[in-house]
């Protein structure tokens, strides 16, 4: 593990984590380590990794972490990488629901797919799961930011683990990523 990944892994028991590190510094791999620990050792049922666009989903392809001394490998069933798959369950939103009802551990989808899944199925269906938000600076405290509103609901409910990853705290506009209460 890189130094940043080790620091993140040391905090793996926390319910909420923010990983702020420059691009190409290993945030995706750090999340793999965290996710595997949470779903294997912390009784977290599943991990849902959400990315802003489909091309970024490639960062979460299967990875042989054991080649580098880790105790497990990162695996995503191809039908649950909705950045590469059209969704085999009647569309991507229905595929999220099917994943939640499955025994599989990892799903990768876009921010948009996740937002629509939360709108369709509510926050309760995500209880006891890890929600990892890549490119977290896309979230905003602005009430018009749907992803930000959903994350606020998850935090208020307190029944999911959240890992937020970003290379920058700044959005390029005047909106705060989180409100002081969050």
What residues fall within each predicted segment?
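Walker A/P-loop
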Residues: 14-34
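Pre-Walker A (Motif I) flank of P-loop NTPase domains
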Residues: 13-19, 45-46, 104-105
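SF2 helicase catalytic motif II
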Residues: 112-113, 122-164, 168-169
């Amino acid at each position: 593990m890189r130094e940043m990944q080790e620091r993140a892994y040391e905090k793996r028991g926390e319910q909420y984590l923010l990983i702020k590190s420059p691009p190409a510094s290993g945030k995706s791999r750090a999340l793999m380590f965290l996710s595997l620990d949470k779903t294997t050792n912390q009784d977290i049922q599943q991990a849902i990794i959400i990315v802003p666009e489909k091309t970024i989903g490639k960062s979460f392809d299967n990875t042989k972490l054991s080649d580098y001394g880790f105790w497990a490998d990162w695996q995503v069933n191809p039908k649950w990488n909705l950045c590469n798959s059209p969704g085999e369950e009647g569309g991507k939103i229905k595929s999220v629901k099917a994943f939640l009802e499955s025994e599989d551990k990892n799903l990768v989808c876009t921010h948009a797919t996740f937002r629509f899944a939360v709108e369709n199925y509510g926050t309760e269906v995500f209880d006891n799961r890890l929600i990892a938000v890549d490119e977290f600076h896309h979230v905003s405290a602005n009430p018009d930011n749907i992803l930000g509103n959903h994350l606020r609901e998850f935090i208020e409910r307190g029944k999911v683990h959240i890992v937020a990853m970003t290379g920058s705290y700044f959005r390029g506009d005047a909106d705060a990523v989180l409100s002081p209460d969050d």
